[in-house]
Regions:
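A short, N-terminal "cap"/entry segment at the start of jelly-roll beta-barrel domains
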Residues: 1-47, 147-181
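Conserved short histidine dyad/triad with adjacent acidic residue
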Residues: 33-37, 48-64
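Short histidine-centered beta-strand/loop micro-motifs
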Residues: 38-39, 59-65, 82, 90-91, ...
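Glycine- and acidic-residue-biased ligand/ion/polar-headgroup-sensing regions
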Residues: 56, 66-79, 83-84
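Ligand-binding loop in jelly-roll beta-barrel domains
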Residues: 79, 103-129
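A hydrophobic, small-residue-rich beta->alpha segment in the mid-to-C-terminal subdomain
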Residues: 129-149
Length: 181
């Protein structure tokens, strides 16, 4: 019940809440990975909360989608690529920084530091479903990724991205912004 006082109070609703909830599902995106803190199938919500990890030396290639995303960096250092009036530019990010990516804005990420780049990602359930469909579930007994795994992932990624209406930069477009695929 909400107290009837002048002090600050927050109504969390009548449904039970959890502190630090997670679905336990983590998927590998052939380098970067995401952990689902909320399920994209959850009803009654218009967002999906993820914890994203980009290992040292790894990039997320140039892409865009109609879904908005907000990133809150929780540890590590990295860079985000944005398209400005003068073309593409990399911006430096560190723990505590927030990045808003509007729908259909071309963007990319890279970790140029020696530790994982970790962020909370607030996005749409649709993008969460995309990650579920394209990612490889992470299990504690997973074997290292092989070149065949990467080739299979790239083919599946392109197919699923097309189904969702997402755009991915070509190898040439990525090379032009400093990402070598």
């Amino acid at each position: 019940m909400r107290p009837e006082t002048d002090s600050e109070s927050y109504c969390l609703g009548e449904r039970a809440t959890e502190i630090n909830p997670t679905t336990g599902m983590r998927v590998d995106l052939t380098g970067p990975s995401v952990e689902f803190l909320t399920s994209p199938q959850e009803t009654g919500t218009d967002f999906c909360l993820l914890r994203g990890v980009i290992p040292p030396g790894v990039s997320v290639p140039l892409h865009s989608h109609p879904d908005t995303e907000d990133f809150i960096v929780i540890s590590g250092e990295g860079q985000a690529l944005r398209q400005g009036t003068g073309g593409y530019e990399w911006i430096e990010l560190k723990a505590g920084d927030h990045v808003h990516v509007p729908g259909n804005a071309p963007h990319a990420w890279r970790n140029t530091a020696g530790a994982p780049f970790v962020s909370f990602i607030i996005t749409t359930p649709k993008l969460g479903k995309f990650f579920q469909e394209v990612g490889r579930p992470i299990k504690s007994t997973d074997q290292p990724v092989t070149p065949e795994d990467i080739a299979d992932f790239v083919a599946r990624f392109q197919s699923v991205a097309g189904k969702f209406g997402y755009w991915n930069g070509t190898p040439e477009e990525n090379a032009a912004v400093g990402i070598n695929l």
